[in-house]
């Protein structure tokens, strides 16, 4: 199981849409002398507060990339996935899950974290920290105070430096309340104290209230009309989710009323249901909460899966084992196929360094902008110059063309002047358009209605770009450059110098 998970993670395409932004922030952390407190990337938030609260995984991503490129990043992703599997297995061992329930839970855990959401993002560290917190609570319940408190401390330190929802690490403490008769006196106090102490190990300890206020503020990208798929409310997503995900979600919904749950002591069920409710609340707010719900409901889910009866006939049991082995072999194969599907066809431009979902559309733009902003004089003049794009493009462009300051990226903390334009997605009749009044370059999808405004604006010129042979223009991002900027960068913006015009 561990080998299948590690190999699957190693072969995953690293196609997470937010990964380039995490790499950009990691680069900033590697090259800066202190911890950022002001916006470092986007001109639309210039001077606004910002904190790199996920600094640990972002720094690791940037270090791995600097050392070995995509191979180093894949190796780090495999290590983190393996650590998550081991953390879950430890919980299964300490809580005496059945062999059958452990296998089913780990199998679904692998599918969720390597196929459904193969995230090379800080959330994966939370998939290590939360199971570690469960393991810590179980050790404290069993009287292993030193090991339990130390594990809770480490889990809290990992979580607070990796993810905004680090407070979820307190939920496993409910297990100590659930088995208060078995747990030694002071076990809960030790768990809470170790967790709170671990949370102090962040460079942003005194800024945590400001971090929560910034990231949980009302935003046009949230809610029922969310333009970002992972921010879609959970029950709305459920109505059109794939059948397998609907089945898993239904199982999660009915966990507290299953016979496997009623077979547990009343106190244990009551407190574990509180943790389940916390996860349900996250799922109701946004579908991305499903994975966190999975982590918070681990004991109840494992009990439900373990209650599924095993086949009695030897031939049927052999078939079940064969299907199990087939799934373990199919996971790496599916990851490899996903990597191949994300690869960009050969073209005269350099191969994208990451198989980002928008790489094929953006690499012609990237090649031209990198060429134009190359060189000491031009680069100095261009650093910090404003550029405008859309949410889906911003993460990749912020990483690939850091010499320009982009209007938006993969974060959800932008002002209404930016986020409302993203929420409406440039539809015809939109009252909101991406802010481009001070931009020297604008990069938009071919269908974006703002493109017609730019075509009619004499201050801008549309740049013809090289594309892969046979690649239709509608699949390549469009680029407009300010005429005065084109004149300032001089010959580099010409047809032959930067390869545009095919």
Which role does the model predict for each range below?
Residues 75-95:
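Transmembrane-helix motifs of polytopic, lipid-linked glycan transferases
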Residues 6, 110-114, 135-136, 147-164, ...:
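Membrane-interface alpha helices of multi-pass inner-membrane proteins
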Residues 18, 30, 71, 164-265, ...:
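Transmembrane catalytic cores of multi-pass membrane glycosyltransferases
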Residues 131-149, 178-179, 255-265:
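Membrane-interface transmembrane helices that cradle and orient dolichyl/undecaprenyl
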Residues 376-418, 438-446, 480:
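Short periplasmic/luminal acceptor-recognition loop of GT-C membrane glycosyltransferases, typified by
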Residues 400, 418-472, 476-477:
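Periplasmic/luminal catalytic loop of GT-C fold multi-pass membrane glycosyltransferases
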Residues 44-71, 75:
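Short hydrophobic/aromatic helix or loop-helix immediately within or flanking a transmembrane segment
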Residues 316-378, 392-394, 401, 421, ...:
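Membrane-proximal, lumen/periplasm-facing interface regions of secretory-pathway glyco-
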